[in-house]
């Protein structure tokens, strides 16, 4: 699915202290599409942007309560409206994350629709994070990973998390049992040939020590 070039950027600028609160009131003030989101070129499926902050030692319930829904996009036009109105990854404070998930599923390991899946996880240089995030977003909503997954699987999300030295990107899939048939990493390397990824691995959600059988953190 070919995607058009983004329209002129209309990004919000962060506060001087670079704190990105984006509470529910502020989310409502973003220049996002008005419901219903039906006009424009439809995506193959809806996708939801999420924002959260992950802190060591938080409980699963606290992790879920920190999660903020930004918007569910149904068209290419509404995707760009959201993307162009949220801060760049490079402007997010430490330990904040963006997620884009298929449908309205939450970026939580034990969410019923996620629990049997896992993630390809990799570290990226900070100067490359914004580009990597954008390219993976476009590949995801454009269903470019479809031919690189098992027929019994699909990519269901992508995340970027701001960390101390290098940032972390994750690509979520729905069925860890068939990951051996996937060529998702090869597609990522093809999309981003000049990016030096580090510590690249795949891990099923159920193998995380914090997997709690019904509630989770990422």
From Swiss-Prot:
Source domain of life: Eukaryota
InterPro entries: TIF_eIF4e-like, TIF_eIF_4E
GO terms for biological process, alphabetical: regulation of translation; translational initiation
Biased composition (Basic and acidic residues): 8-23
Chain sites annotated for binding mRNA: 109-110, 163-168
Region (Disordered): 1-23
The entry's keywords: Initiation factor, Protein biosynthesis, RNA-binding, Translation regulation
One CC-aspect GO term: eukaryotic translation initiation factor 4F complex
Coiled coil: none
A GO term, aspect molecular function: translation initiation factor activity
Signal peptide: none
Cross-referenced PANTHER family: EUKARYOTIC TRANSLATION INITIATION FACTOR 4E RELATED, EUKARYOTIC TRANSLATION INITIATION FACTOR 4E TYPE 3
Family in the record: Belongs to the eukaryotic initiation factor 4E family.
Description of how the protein assembles with itself and partners: eIF4F is a multi-subunit complex, the composition of which varies with external and internal environmental conditions. It is composed of at least eIF4A, eIF4E and eIF4G.
Biological role stated in the UniProt entry: Recognizes and binds the 7-methylguanosine-containing mRNA cap during an early step in the initiation of protein synthesis.
Name of the protein in question: Eukaryotic translation initiation factor 4E type 3-B
Organism: Xenopus laevis
Gene transcribed to yield this protein: eif4e3-b
